Amino acid sequence: MDVSRVCIYLGNTHLYSPTCVLYNLFFNSNQMDTLQPISPSELIINPDGSIFHLHVKPGQLADKVILVGDPGRVPMVAAHFDTCECDVSSREFRTMTGTFRGKRISVVSTGIGCDNIDIVLNELDALANIDFATRTLRPELRRLEIVRLGTCGGLQPFTPVGTFVASEVSIGFDGLLNFYADRNRVAELPFEQAFRAHMNWHGEQCIAYPYVVHADKELLDRIAADDMVRGITVACGGFYGPQGRRLRLPLADPEANRKLEAFTYGGLHVTNFEMESSAVAGLSLMLGHKAMTCCMVIANRVAGKADAEYKNSIDKLIRLVLERI
């Protein structure tokens, strides 16, 4: 075992990595002294004691968290709650915490993209694991269960509009994890090498260095039953060019979607496009939380079909996640 990281075996076997979870919340030699207060410029706390962007206070966060992109989807999820204890909004971030069949759950909107996931995941972890009074890490670290519930574009004939897809593996085109020291500790490096070779990108073409991360196996198995298709999800840094859509601007790699459709690794196909799963899985793994993403296909790029009236049918996916989280 690599002794430079603290690794606790939690029974979570990765498909492409060592049979342990990196539960290395700030225990890495590159990371901060756990007794050293975090400065106000690094951890910004609002005057009411809430975290900077989310405006949520530590006591308002449940251990089970559902992430949605659209703030309007938060009350759609919370409508199924038996009780609701808080409803907090700030910018595109809305949080409602309540109970569903005895389970305390927070549903949080993230907005669109991995840049927003960087804000949300770091602030959720701060709420869970930093003492706001002393600005130091709590002695007992808290592990969250995080499920992103969203929409996506299908990339295979077997993922038509309406399919529920679970991201067993996510490929990040956004570059976010490349800014963190633990990037190579959580990434699936042989998978990355095989993917880069397959895409055959050179020079400045699609230059963000793709990273590959795996969902938490136990949480994936619990959420993704036989009613979901498992596969590889590509998390893009945009909706148009990065996902191969051309309106007026030409694409750097017009063949990218065809190459993605043909790529396989470890028996898995690239099933779908979205814009957040890689950051959710990667940051959660770095921070010691359990995370996975499941989405409903609302556009199939192979068939050229889309459903803009998907909001009624996504309620089935909401109920499934609430029952299984």
Q: Where are each of the predicted segments found?
A:
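Glycine-rich phosphate/pyrophosphate-binding loops
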Residues: 287-302
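Short hydrophobic targeting helices and cationic amphipathic motifs
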Residues: 10, 15-17, 25
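A C-terminal functional module that forms or caps the active site or interfaces directly
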Residues: 245, 251, 259-287
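Metabolite-binding pocket within alpha/beta catalytic cores that recognizes anionic/polar moieties
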Residues: 33-211
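His/Asp/Glu-rich mid-to-C-terminal helical/loop segments that flank catalytic regions of hydrolases
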Residues: 300-325
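Active-site rim beta-loop-alpha module in soluble metabolic enzymes
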Residues: 192-264
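Alpha-helix C-terminal capping segments
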Residues: 154-159, 282-290
